């Protein structure tokens, strides 16, 4: 079929030419202690941040001098863990799967380095002594779950792949092929992906003559038509 010929000819070649985002090394922890002195969001930057970013973008090696994001959500939401316990979300940006790192053999070693850095740089000096539940996701796991080359933020946001220059929501080689997600217009990040879904949904409705209410949340917000008390994710999603 014509569609199959187009797909075989274009997709592999185009994907190889694209620049992709970093991947992430994730640690999800259940901890039998509250770290009330730690903020909800905490970012530990690499000592040599420029070198850390270069390691990731060049896709050459896993950086030992890593940057770490920690979400300590239990201090603002007591329901995410049992009383007196914490749920910690730890994200480490790292190289994607275009680099042939053996994560199965390296996972434990890298995990220990991340925990050691957190204990050194934060008030969670005894973190390793209080871990009761643990789950780790490596770039290899992301790839196994269908994330292309384990690039968790999809196409990178360089000047040649931003906004209109990202793949369009209606693919121009197929009549009934619509795209949605972080790799399409307008970009990655949860709010932006919601917008991508809205754009694609509206395009499908337009094609099949389905009426829908066009809601311009940005204009409503800026023009004061949404009360400040309602300017929350929950309020928007419930409408």
Give residue spans per PLM region.
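Mid-domain catalytic core of redox enzymes
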Residues: 1-81, 222
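Hydrophobic, well-ordered secondary-structure elements that form the walls
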Residues: 29, 90, 118, 177, ...
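Conserved FAD/dinucleotide-binding core of flavoprotein oxidoreductases
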Residues: 30-32, 82-119
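Flavin-binding catalytic cores
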Residues: 34-35, 61-63, 103-141
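A glycine-rich dinucleotide-binding beta-alpha-beta segment and adjacent secondary-structure elements
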Residues: 63-69, 124-186
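Short glycine/proline-enriched loop/turn "hinge" motifs that connect secondary-structure elements
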Residues: 78-85, 168-173
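A conserved FAD-binding loop/helix module that cradles the flavin
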Residues: 182-204
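Active-site-proximal substrate-binding core of FAD-dependent oxidoreductases
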Residues: 205-239
């Amino acid at each position: 079929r014509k569609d199959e010929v187009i797909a075989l000819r274009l997709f592999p070649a185009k994907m190889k030419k694209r620049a992709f985002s970093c991947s992430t090394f994730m640690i999800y922890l259940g901890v039998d202690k509250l770290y009330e002195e730690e903020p909800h969001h905490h970012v530990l930057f690499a000592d040599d941040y420029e070198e850390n970013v270069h390691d990731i973008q060049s896709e050459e090696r896993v950086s030992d001098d890593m940057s770490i994001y920690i979400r300590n959500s239990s201090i603002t939401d007591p329901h995410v863990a049992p009383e007196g316990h914490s749920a910690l979300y730890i994200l480490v940006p790292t190289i994607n799967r275009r680099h042939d790192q053996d994560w199965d053999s390296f996972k434990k070693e890298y995990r220990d380095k991340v925990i050691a850095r957190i204990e050194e740089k934060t008030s969670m000096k005894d973190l390793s002594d209080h871990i009761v539940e643990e789950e780790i996701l490596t770039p290899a796991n992301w790839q196994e779950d269908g994330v292309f080359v384990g690039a968790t933020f999809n196409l990178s946001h360089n000047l040649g792949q931003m906004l209109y220059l990202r793949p369009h929501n209606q693919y121009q080689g197929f009549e009934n092929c619509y795209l949605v997600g972080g790799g399409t217009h307008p970009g990655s990040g949860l709010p932006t992906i919601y917008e991508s879904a809205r754009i694609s949904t509206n395009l499908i409705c337009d094609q099949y003559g389905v009426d829908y209410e066009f809601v311009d949340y940005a204009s409503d917000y800026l023009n004061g038509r949404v009360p400040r008390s309602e300017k929350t994710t929950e309020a928007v999603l419930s409408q």
